[in-house]
C-alpha cells in the first residue's frame, strides 16, 4: 500500500466530556471492537496478554479520574484508528487543550440525564475554535434521562452548534427498548436475541408501546422542522451528528463507531507560524510534540515525547531537525501505544501519534522536520496559573531526586515552576488544586522524594522584558521570580497590586503570557 493510501486510512480523534459522563467506558468499548481488549475494563497488551486499564497512572486508578492523556491505536474496518483520551477534570484543561491540537475530530460524550455540563462546554469551545468536526454520543440511555428533543435544543442553545440525530431512542431507563436508526434505516433492539429489525416491523414488535409511538412522533417532527443532513457541514464543524446509546451496556456503540468512521476526516494539514499549511501528503516528514510524559513505565524511569505526525512518513532511525534549537536528532527508539502496552515502531505516517524516548531534548510545542525546508508549527495554547505553592524537599538527603522530579514533571507541562529572585525558593503554579495533589503524589511515588508544600494562595502573574528588570521593583505586594526559561515574572498579590505597579512604572510592559 502506498504512503498516500496509508495516510488516507488514518482517523485520529479525541474524546471529550465532563467527568463521569462515561468517557472511559466508551473508550474501552471502542477498544473492544478494535480487538485490543477482551472485555470492557481490561486492556490487553498485544504481546504479553497482560491486563491493564486505559487509566495507567496509580492516582487515576485510585480516584477514578483521568489526569493524563492516553494514546490508543487499533485497526477496524480498514481504518487505522488513533484515540486520544483526554483528562476530564477541569484542573487539567491545559494538557487537554494541547491534545486537542493533535487531532482531526472530536467525539463529545454527554450524560443524557445531565446534558451539557461545564467542562464539556469549555472543551467544546476549543474544538469549535479549531473548526474540527464534532460527533456527539448521548450516553446512559439505560438510565432515565432528559427528553431527547431537549438535549438537541441544548446543543444548539448552549454550544451554538446545529445537530442532526443519526438515531433516536425508544424509551429510556427501565423502559428502554432500543434505537430507531434513521441513518441506516433499521431498528436496533435492546432486548431479546435479535440485534436488528426492519423499520416496517416496528409496529408489530412494539404494538401498543407508548414509547415507540412517541419516538415516531418525535421523528416526524424532526423530519419536518429539524436540520438537514450535510456531510460538508459536519466536516466544517457546523453540524454535529448525534448518536444515542449506552456505553455501559455496550448498546449503540458499534453503530456509532461504524458510522463515525464513514464521516470522520482524514488527517488534515497544520499551520506554521508563517501562516502556511503543511499538507499531510507532503513526502517530507514533519511533526510536533504536543505532550511529554515521565514515568509511563516506573520500572525504567523513562520519559516519552508524544509527537503528532503532520506530513510524510516516519522511518525508524531517521534524522530530524529540531527547529527550536537548530540541532539534529535521531529517532531510533520510538513506540506506539495501547494504554500501558507499547511496541517499537518501524514506520508511521501522517495522522499517527508516536512516542519518542526523551532524555531532555524535547519541549512541548517543538517542531520536527526533515530536509532543507525548516519551519515551525504554530504554538500550542498555554495558560497562566492562578494558584501557587512554595515547594521544597522534606529530606535534604533527597535533593537529587527532588530536583530530577521537579525538572521532569515541569517539562511535561503538568505544572509550572518559578524561582524566587531573592531567595531562590521554588514556587509551583497551577490552574487548579488537583494539579498540586498529583504533583505531590508523583514526586513521592515515582521519584521517592517527599515534598513540603506551603500554599501561597491566588496570584496575578505578569511577565516583563529582561531589559526592563530592576530588582528594586520588588515589594511587599509582589514577588519577583524567574520562570523555567529564566524570564523575569512578577507574582502580584491581587489586581490592586498589579494596578499600583502599572501606575508606578508606566514604561514597563506587563505581559499576561510569554
UniProtKB/Swiss-Prot annotation:
Q: Where is this chain's protein located in or outside the cell?
A: Cytoplasm
Which cysteines are cross-linked by disulfides?
none
UniProt keywords (A-Z) are:
Cytoplasm, GTP-binding, Nucleotide-binding, Protein biosynthesis
Top-rank lineage group of the source organism: Bacteria
User: Mostly located where?
Assistant: cytoplasm
GO BP, one annotated term:
regulation of translational termination
Q: Name one GO cellular component term.
A: cytosol
Q: Tell me the Pfam families matching this sequence.
A: EF-G_D2, GTP_EFTU, RF3_C
Domain tr-type G as annotated: residue spans? 8-268
Q: Which residues bind GTP?
A: 17-24, 85-89, 139-142
Matching entries from SUPFAM superfamilies are given as: EF-G C-terminal domain-like, P-loop containing nucleoside triphosphate hydrolases, Translation proteins
One GO molecular-function entry: GTPase activity
Query: Family assignment?
Result: Belongs to the TRAFAC class translation factor GTPase superfamily. Classic translation factor GTPase family. PrfC subfamily.
Q: What does this protein do?
A: Increases the formation of ribosomal termination complexes and stimulates activities of RF-1 and RF-2. It binds guanine nucleotides and has strong preference for UGA stop codons. It may interact directly with the ribosome. The stimulation of RF-1 and RF-2 is significantly reduced by GTP and GDP, but not by GMP.
Which protein is depicted? Peptide chain release factor 3
Origin organism of this chain?
A: Streptococcus thermophilus (strain ATCC BAA-250 / LMG 18311)
* Lineage of the species this protein comes from: Bacteria, Bacillati, Bacillota, Bacilli, Lactobacillales
Amino acid at each position: 500500500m502506498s504512503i498516500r493510501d496509508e495516510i488516507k486510512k488514518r482517523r485520529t480523534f479525541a474524546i471529550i466530556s465532563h467527568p463521569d459522563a462515561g468517557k472511559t467506558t466508551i473508550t474501552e468499548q471502542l477498544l473492544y471492537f478494535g480487538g485490543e481488549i477482551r472485555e470492557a475494563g481490561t486492556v490487553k497488551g498485544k504481546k504479553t496478554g497482560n491486563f491493564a486499564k486505559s487509566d495507567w497512572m496509580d492516582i487515576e486508578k485510585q480516584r477514578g479520574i483521568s489526569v493524563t492523556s492516553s494514546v490508543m491505536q487499533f485497526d477496524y474496518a480498514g481504518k487505522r484508528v488513533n484515540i486520544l483520551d483526554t483528562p476530564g477534570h477541569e484542573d487539567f484543561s491545559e494538557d487537554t487543550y494541547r491534545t486537542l491540537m493533535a487531532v482531526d475530530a472530536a467525539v463529545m460524550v454527554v450524560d443524557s440525564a445531565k446534558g451539557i455540563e461545564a467542562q464539556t462546554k469549555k472543551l467544546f469551545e476549543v474544538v469549535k475554535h479549531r473548526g474540527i468536526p464534532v460527533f456527539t454520543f448521548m450516553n446512559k440511555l439505560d438510565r432515565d434521562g432528559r427528553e431527547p428533543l431537549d438535549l438537541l435544543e441544548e446543543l444548539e442553545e448552549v454550544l451554538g452548534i446545529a445537530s442532526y440525530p443519526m438515531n433516536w431512542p425508544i424509551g429510556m431507563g427501565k423502559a428502554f427498548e432500543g434505537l430507531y436508526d434513521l441513518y441506516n434505516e433499521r431498528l436496533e433492539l435492546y432486548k431479546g436475541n435479535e440485534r436488528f429489525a426492519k423499520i416496517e416491523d416496528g409496529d408489530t414488535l412494539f404494538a401498543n408501546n407508548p414509547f415507540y409511538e412517541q419516538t415516531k412522533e418525535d421523528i416526524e417532527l424532526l423530519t419536518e422542522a429539524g436540520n438537514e443532513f450535510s456531510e460538508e457541514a459536519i466536516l466544517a464543524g457546523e453540524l454535529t451528528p448525534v448518536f444515542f446509546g449506552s456505553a455501559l451496556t455496550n448498546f449503540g456503540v458499534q453503530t456509532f463507531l461504524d458510522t463515525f468512521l464513514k464521516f470522520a476526516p482524514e488527517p488534515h494539514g497544520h499551520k506554521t507560524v508563517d501562516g502556511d499549511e503543511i499538507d499531510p501528503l507532503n513526502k517530507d516528514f514533519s511533526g510536533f510534540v504536543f505532550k511529554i510524559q515521565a514515568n509511563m513505565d516506573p520500572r525504567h524511569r523513562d520519559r516519552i515525547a508524544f509527537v503528532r505526525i503532520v506530513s510524510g512518513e516516519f522511518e525508524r532511525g531517521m534524522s530530524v531537525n529540531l527547529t527550536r534549537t537548530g540541532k539534529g536528532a535521531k529517532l531510533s527508539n520510538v513506540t506506539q501505544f495501547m494504554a500501558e502496552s507499547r511496541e517499537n515502531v518501524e514506520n508511521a505516517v501522517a495522522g499517527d501519534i508516536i512516542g519518542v524516548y526523551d532524555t531532555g531534548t524535547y519541549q512541548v510545542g517543538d517542531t520536527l522536520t526533515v530536509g532543507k525546508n525548516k519551519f515551525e508549527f504554530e504554538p500550542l495554547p498555554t495558560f497562566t496559573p492562578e494558584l501557587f505553592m512554595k515547594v521544597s524537599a522534606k529530606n535534604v538527603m533527597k535533593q537529587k531526586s527532588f530536583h530530577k522530579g521537579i525538572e521532569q514533571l515541569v517539562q511535561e507541562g503538568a505544572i509550572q515552576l518559578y524561582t524566587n529572585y531573592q531567595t531562590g525558593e521554588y514556587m509551583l503554579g497551577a490552574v487548579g488544586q488537583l494539579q498540586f495533589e498529583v504533583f505531590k503524589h508523583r514526586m513521592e511515588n515515582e521519584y521517592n522524594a517527599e515534598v513540603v508544600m506551603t500554599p501561597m494562595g491566588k496570584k496575578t502573574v505578569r511577565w516583563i522584558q529582561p531589559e526592563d528588570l530592576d530588582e528594586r521593583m520588588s515589594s511587599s505586594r509582589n514577588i519577583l521570580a524567574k520562570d523555567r526559561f529564566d524570564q523575569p515574572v512578577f507574582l502580584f498579590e491581587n489586581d490592586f497590586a498589579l494596578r499600583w505597579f502599572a501606575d508606578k512604572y508606566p514604561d514597563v510592559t506587563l505581559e499576561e503570557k510569554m
